[in-house]
Design a protein with these regions (language model features):
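Glycine-rich beta-alpha loop segments
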Residues: 2-14, 18-22, 27-121, 130
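Solvent-exposed alpha-helices and their adjacent loops that cap or buttress functional pockets
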Residues: 56-58, 87-89, 111-112, 129-133, ...
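Structural motif
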Residues: 61-64, 94, 116-120, 136-138, ...
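Acidic/glycine-enriched connector segments
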Residues: 79, 102-161
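Short acidic, glycine/serine/threonine-rich loops at helix termini
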Residues: 108-110, 130-133, 170-173, 200-203
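Short gly/pro/ser/thr-enriched loop/turn and capping motifs at secondary-structure boundaries
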Residues: 124-130, 167, 195-198
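Active-site/ligand-binding-proximal alpha/beta "capping" segment
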Residues: 142-194, 238-243
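C-terminal functional extensions of proteins
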Residues: 190-258
Length: 258
């Protein structure tokens, strides 16, 4: 464990907000209990939800783009993420990312260069993850689950580029929300067929064949290598969605007030 890159129980760095929430509280004196209690922390969580909702209230029908923070600008997937986000922005679609480097930067760059709304929802981490320079709106969250709510609430499609644990977490949470009927079916697009081939094969040959999911659950996502096709899938889904005139007018009013 001494050579592990991950945080050890003896790590004396200040804990993150998520860590404090998930830890069992130590014994405390009565006068300390409330201000350091989980009940008090719930108020902070509520405040972060309200703050996030307020800052994104004018955003509707966006697209959240996920992918690795480690992707370099010379990587073909970085270039494709720029192109994809630019097409979305030129169609008037807000682009939302985690606000960091790599694929997130590429998507925000494409959105900004396409003249669209480029949103970054960053997160407090034990190590620094600075915001990328292509954001027209930057939000910094302390709690992962609040941030993830924003990704879903203000988007009507997910485009998932190659990534690691964080990307997979966001992908499978979206698929679970759709599968369980917690949200209506929205496009989940896996970008990069070669990268995702192993995962798709495992879901098909192992998970579905062993009846851990239904065969129809494999229809919850699409795979592409083409920015134009990804944008087309998003726009076709938007065209099928019934318009909410009240929501549209409210969003337009909020945008004009900013």
């Amino acid at each position: 464990m001494t050579n592990s890159p991950y945080r050890h129980v003896s790590d004396n760095k200040l804990p993150t907000e998520d860590e404090q929430l998930l830890e069992s509280p130590p014994p405390q004196r009565p006068e300390q209990i409330f201000l350091k209690s989980d009940s008090w922390r719930v108020l902070r969580i509520m405040g972060e939800f309200v703050w996030g909702f307020d800052n994104l209230a004018d955003v509707s029908d966006g697209v959240t783009i996920f992918g690795s923070a480690r992707t370099q600008s010379i990587d073909p997937h970085y270039v494709k993420a720029v192109q994809t986000a630019m097409l979305l922005a030129q169609a008037g679609i807000p682009v939302i990312t985690g606000g960091g480097p790599g694929i997130m930067e590429a998507a925000n760059r494409g959105a900004k260069e396409g003249g669209g709304l480029s949103i970054g929802c960053n997160i407090e981490l034990p190590f620094e993850q600075g915001s990328n320079p292509y954001l027209s709106r930057s939000l910094n969250f302390k709690f992962f689950f609040v941030r993830k709510t924003m990704f879903v609430k203000y988007a009507t499609a997910f485009i998932v580029f190659p990534g690691g644990y964080g990307t997979l977490d966001e992908l499978f949470e979206a698929l679970t929300l759709i599968q369980t009927g917690k949200v209506k079916h929205f496009p989940v697009i896996l970008f990069g067929s070669a990268y995702w081939a192993g995962l798709v094969e495992w879901l098909t040959r192992t998970v579905a064949e062993e009846r851990k999911i239904n065969p129809t659950d494999l229809l919850l996502f699409r795979v592409t290598d083409d920015p134009a096709e990804a944008a087309r899938i998003v726009m076709e889904a938007r065209a099928e969605k019934p318009e909410d005139p009240v929501a549209r007018m409210t969003a337009e009013h909020l945008r004009s007030a900013r």
